[in-house]
Design a protein with these regions (language model features):
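N-terminal small-domain helix-loop-helix segment of the aminotransferase-like
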Residues: 2-90, 97, 274-277, 378, ...
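A non-catalytic, amphipathic alpha-helix used as a structural packing/dimerization or gating element
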Residues: 52, 63, 67, 247, ...
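Conserved core of the PLP fold type I
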Residues: 55-183, 200-201, 207-216, 369, ...
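Helix C-cap/helix->beta junction micro-motif
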Residues: 126, 187-188, 217, 303, ...
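Conserved core segment of the aminotransferase class I/II
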Residues: 215, 219-290
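PLP-dependent enzyme catalytic core of the Aspartate aminotransferase-like
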Residues: 217, 328-331, 335-341, 346-383
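Conserved glycine-rich beta-strand-loop-beta hairpin in the small C-terminal domain of fold type I
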Residues: 272, 288-297, 308-321, 349
Length: 383
């Protein structure tokens, strides 16, 4: 019913993912956008709006708001009030605004590394101080070192900046983990800003927004969502914050005033279509991504010197190359025809790369073949 196998030639259009390696035989599997055609209901809605031929000013309209509220309740068992919504051009904007209201200049924003690179820059962008705590791997999965979390929170800390589901390690944090974070936020009077942009791409288990745990944590929460990653429409620039507490919401909106533009009207059209009509496509996508995820995990397990954990969400695999003797694995793999994200950009120590498996199987299999061939060339005894 849905076609995820057709390879679309993206080299003909000026997009960031493929333009990076223009004219070079390097397969781009780095930045987090997928190589699939956008869901037809979204394309139809965009065409219908364009065919009106007039682009007037338009804020979020009632049917859009109702659709988002209903979708969040259906997908995440979280009933929100429409008044809690603050519309944004994207979640990166959203967590930068959150940092701007976290205490005073110089105060701390704590996040767990490795993490989506803009997390590492948002505190400094707003005059705050970045504080980090490293996630730890137990051999099978990444998680929290609670003693390290407690040690990282100090008198300066004003906000916990959370990524859930997590980019790049692919975790969907459990209710117990989220409860432990919420307890620390309440004990230290921290705002919790949670980037949940990948919540529609859960491959195993279910996603729980931290604000949905209870009213107490909801009152200190800013939850960021968007359809952009799930339906592959990030450049349409539309998302939203969910802020239950009226006082916190007013502070957030004041920080936005005069600086943050309204979402793109076509982005809002696409958002309504995605949440209203895009779920069959999304479910088929998740099934396809599960197959891709399993291909990646199996292929990496078969290559000596490389290892990865099984992502519970997203279309991203976090690959540990430290046992392969590579000083710069991202550059090494580029030299062998495969473009991956450099793990150092995520606040990780040297030796990690991130692979985007949101692509047709033909593309993925070629990428995995190139990775295996590169390792065989580096270590002929691996063959």
């Amino acid at each position: 019913m849905f076609d995820f196998d057709t390879v679309i030639d993206r080299r003909a259009i000026p997009d960031e993912k493929w333009a990076r390696y223009a004219g070079r035989d390097i397969l781009p599997m780095w930045v987090a956008d997928m190589d699939f055609a956008t869901a037809q209901p979204i394309l139809d809605a965009l065409h219908a709006r364009i065919d009106q031929k007039v682009f007037g000013y338009a804020g979020p309209w009632q049917s859009l708001i109702d659709t988002v509220v209903q979708s969040i309740e259906h997908d995440h068992d979280w009933r929100i009030d429409p008044d809690w919504l603050v519309w944004l051009p994207g979640v990166v904007t959203g967590f930068n605004v959150a940092c701007a209201i976290a205490g005073e200049p110089g105060d701390g924003v704590l996040t767990a590394t490795p993490v989506y690179p803009p997390f590492l820059h948002a505190p400094a962008n707003t005059g705050r101080t970045l504080q980090t705590v490293a996630l730890v791997e137990d051999g099978n999965q990444w998680g929290w070192d609670w003693d390290a979390v407690d040690a990282a929170i100090d008198a300066r800390t004003r906000m916990l900046l959370l990524c859930n589901p997590h980019n790049p390690v692919g975790r969907v944090f459990t209710r117990d983990e989220l409860t432990a974070l919420a307890e620390r936020a309440e004990a230290h009077d921290l705002i919790v800003c949670s980037d949940d942009i990948h919540c529609g791409l859960v491959l195993d288990g279910t996603h729980t927004p931290i604000a949905a745990l209870n009213e107490s944590i909801a009152r200190r929460s800013i939850t960021l969502m968007a359809p952009s990653k799930t339906w592959n429409i990030a450049p349409l620039y539309a998302g939203f914050a969910i802020i239950p507490d009226a006082s916190l919401r007013k502070r957030y909106q004041r920080a936005m005033h005069g600086l943050i533009p309204y979402p793109n009207v076509l982005g809002l059209v696409a958002t309504e279509a995605a949440y209203r009509d895009g779920d069959p496509w999304r479910r088929a996508l998740i099934d396809y991504l599960r197959g891709n995820r399993d291909r990646v995990v199996d292929a990496i397990a078969a290559i000596p010197g490389l290892r990865t954990t099984r992502p519970e969400a997203t279309y991203l695999a976090w690959i540990d190359c430290r046992d392969a003797g590579l000083t710069d694995p991202a550059a090494f793999f580029e030299d062998h025809g495969i473009g991956l994200s450099d793990g150092r950009h995520f606040g990780a120590p040297p030796g990690f790369v991130r692979l985007n498996f949101g692509c047709p199987r033909q593309t993925l299999d070629e990428g995995l073949r190139r990775i295996a061939a590169a390792m065989t060339a580096q270590h002929p005894g691996y063959a």
